UniProtKB/Swiss-Prot annotation:
Belongs to the SERAC1 family. It is found in: Mitochondrion membrane; Endoplasmic reticulum; Mitochondrion. SUPFAM superfamilies: alpha/beta-Hydrolases, ARM repeat. Testis. Higher expression at both mRNA and protein levels in brain and skeletal muscles, than in other organs. Facilitates the transport of serine from the cytosol to the mitochondria by interacting with and stabilizing Sideroflexin-1 (SFXN1), a mitochondrial serine transporter, playing a fundamental role in the one-carbon cycle responsible for the synthesis of nucleotides needed for mitochondrial DNA replication. Plays an important role in the phosphatidylglycerol (PG) remodeling that is essential for both mitochondrial function and intracellular cholesterol trafficking. This is Protein SERAC1. One of its GO terms (cellular component) is extracellular matrix. InterPro entries: AB_hydrolase_fold, ARM-like, ARM-type_fold, SERAC1. Its main location: mitochondrion. It comes from Mus musculus (Mouse). The gene is Serac1. It is a single-pass membrane protein.
Length: 654
């Protein structure tokens, strides 16, 4: 700059000189002009070149910075000296609170003005981020439970950290903190490291063979008939064993007929499903869970889970096994170290209610910090599925009926699905589980539980032909599972469909005989029956008429009008309910139901659905749709919601 200024001054001087006499030579002036002009051009060129290079340097991105950031994201080198941070004074605390208040104010202003909240305001903090991260980690290891929960809550609310700070937490936190983050609704998935690499399969092996090997290694003695059936079915339905059986009537000279061979081939996926169903049954036995873990089952199941992302049934069975294993607290370290918490945290955020509910059950069984109950196989919490500060004041239990399930029985009416197929599906317009979507929003202080058990109309369609479970047997089995889940400790309402209502009645009668279950009786505030055959079902009558063709199951036989067990159950329940202070609401269908493609039957007539206690409301639907409201504003849902709110009004206020 000084050189350019000097050139300008010289030019001005030349321009201000008076004309010289003709006696002096003009060449000297020309030489001076050329000298000054050259200096000006050279100096200006150097200045412009310098500015261009400086600007280019400032605009270039140093890729080494990105590489260093990547390394820091996965590996932390040293631990921050948190001891000295405890001595920070009130000035630091004041600055921290002031900055937090300003950040919240900016976020609120951005929301009001509908403009994006600049990341620079959220990532730039007065305090040292790394020190804050290590302070939270230290707080999460304190002996005080409240302090640990507060630390996890603060971690889950952090959404503007750098990637490496989430990785520091992921690598340095203890298992209970990791589980707490997985059960926190707002947790960032960057808190969870990918599962460790799976061991390679043995040479010339497959997942099918590994599954069969794991199943064969489990104890085969002292098993009930159904578990023996599932195990033998899975071990026999292998491609190798069927290939060895291709002889016989369809084989001549050792060469099987081509079409006969096609009959014997079982797809690998089918064999895997047989094995998984057998392992599910084994995982209900605590001692067998130890054998599954020792045999590398956690890694093998994870391989199946990753391979069958497009098969929800496989994934649900895998999660059922992990959820059953999580009931055993001594297996928690193995489950955490194998990477299942990361997978469950991701599944919990799924938009598919069934997948999220299976993950919620597994994580709840792992979380011993905030959950005292244990959710056994077939018991699913629909709400709340995450840690919450909302106090839970009452329970609502959903019990399905014949051929039902914990989720599909309580879906919205199928006619509404077609209306939303071409549009973006809004959960308020269609839901696959209205207790989870609608009731949880309308009554957030309720714990909503749905249970599942196997049923069949015919022994031909039974999953286990040897299974002969009466209503009395199933009610005792369900009652034991519900007590393990803490049912009876709070005020509660039972909601049942079809045979599920008979199970509710039997469970209450059984509980009344046991002094330790008095709390369950006293806390029962109400029961809703959706088309429950208190006096028998016409389905049972029809099944008896064609019993040699249909082979009705034991459950169906017990629903006949002349069933002594059904009449005794009705009489005993009416006697039991005389001095009990709970409300009853009965719904009943008025339309017949198609059973198969040819049979049309009024499954539960009005006279059979009349318990003799409470209101009886006929609804113009069939037996399957009596518990499936068309919309959130439909009479079925609104009347159910009204009953719940009125029955639990005093408990919800408290």
């Amino acid at each position: 700059m000084s050189l350019a200024a000097y050139c300008v001054i010289c030019c001005r001087r030349i321009g201000s000189f008076a004309p010289r006499s003709k006696s002096r030579t003009p060449w000297r002036n020309i030489r001076n002009i050329i000298r000054f002009t050259g200096s000006l051009i050279v100096g200006g060129s150097l200045f412009i070149t310098y500015e261009v290079l400086a600007l280019k340097k400032s605009l270039m991105l140093d890729t080494q910075v990105v590489e260093r950031e990547k390394m820091k994201s996965y590996i932390y080198v040293h631990k921050a000296p948190v001891d000295r941070l405890d001595n920070r004074g009130i000035v630091w605390q004041a600055r921290k609170e002031l900055h937090r208040a300003v950040r919240k104010l900016l976020a609120a202003a951005a929301k009001v003005l509908r403009s994006p909240f600049a990341d620079s305001f959220s990532t730039v903090d007065i305090e040292d981020h790394d020190c804050a991260v290590w302070l939270l980690l230290r707080k999460s290891r304190e002996d005080d439970l409240a302090a640990r929960l507060q630390a996890v809550r603060e971690m889950s609310e952090a959404h503007h950290w750098h990637d490496y700070q989430y990785r520091i937490i992921a690598q340095a936190c203890d298992p209970r903190t990791l589980i707490g983050l997985a059960r926190s609704k707002e947790s960032d998935l960057r808190f969870f490291l990918p599962p460790p690499p799976l061991p390679s399969l043995k040479e010339d092996s497959s997942t099918e063979e590994e599954l069969r090997h794991l199943l064969a290694s489990l104890p085969q003695t002292e098993l009930d008939e159904c578990l023996q059936y599932f195990t033998s079915l899975a071990l026999s339905e292998s491609s190798q064993s069927l290939a060895a059986q291709k002889g016989g009537l369809w084989c001549f000279g050792g060469n099987g007929l081509p079409y006969a061979e096609s009959f014997g081939k079982v797809p690998s996926a089918t064999v895997e499903m047989f094995c998984l169903e057998a392992i599910v049954k084994h995982s209900e036995i605590p001692s067998h869970c130890d054998h599954i873990e020792a045999g590398g089952g956690l890694q093998l199941l994870q391989r199946l889970y990753q391979l069958h992302k497009d098969c929800p049934k496989v994934q649900r069975n895998v999660m059922r096994i992990i959820g059953n294993m999580a009931l055993n607290e001594h297996l928690h370290p193995a489950i955490v170290h194998s990477g299942w918490v990361s997978l469950m945290a991701e599944a919990l955020k799924s938009s598919h209610i069934m997948e999220a509910s299976h993950a919620a059950r597994t994580l709840a069984n792992l979380d011993r910090e905030t959950v005292g109950e244990k959710y056994q196989d077939g018991v699913y919490v629909l709400h709340p599925q995450c840690r919450t500060s909302q106090p839970i004041k009452a329970d609502v239990l959903f019990i399905h009926g014949l051929m039902g399930a914990a989720f599909k029985t309580w879906r919205q009416h199928d006619s509404q699905r077609a209306l939303t197929e071409s549009a973006v599906v809004d959960e308020d317009r269609y839901t696959t589980c209205w207790p989870k979507t609608w009731l949880a929003k309308d009554c957030p202080s309720l714990r909503i539980i749905s249970v599942e058990y196997d049923t069949s109309l015919s022994d031909w369609r039974a999953r286990c032909p040897m299974e002969r479970k009466s209503i009395a047997f199933r009610s005792n089995e369900l009652l034991s599972k519900l007590r393990a889940a803490g049912v009876g400790d709070r005020p509660m309402i039972w909601i049942s469909h079809s045979m599920g209502g008979l199970l509710v009645k039997k469970m209450l009668l059984e509980a009344s005989k046991k002094p330790e279950l008095n709390a369950l009786i006293n806390n029962t505030r109400g029961i809703i029956f959706y088309s429950v055959p208190h006096h028998g079902s016409r389905l049972a009558e029809y099944s008896v008429n064609i019993r040699y063709l249909l082979f009705p199951s034991l459950e169906v036989k017990e629903l006949s009008k002349d069933s002594p067990a059904l009449k005794t159950l009705q009489d005993d329940f009416l006697e039991f309910a005389k001095d009990k202070n709970f409300q009853v609401l009965n719904f009943v269908e008025t339309q017949p139901t198609f059973i198969g493609s040819m049979i049309k039957l009024h499954v539960v007539p009005v006279e059979s659905a009349d318990l003799g206690i409470g209101d009886l409301i006929p609804v113009d639907v069939n037996h399957l749709n009596i518990c499936k409201p068309k919309t959130k504003d439909a009479f079925l849902y609104q009347r159910t919601l009204q009953f719940i709110c009125e029955t639990l009004a005093r408990d919800l206020e408290n």
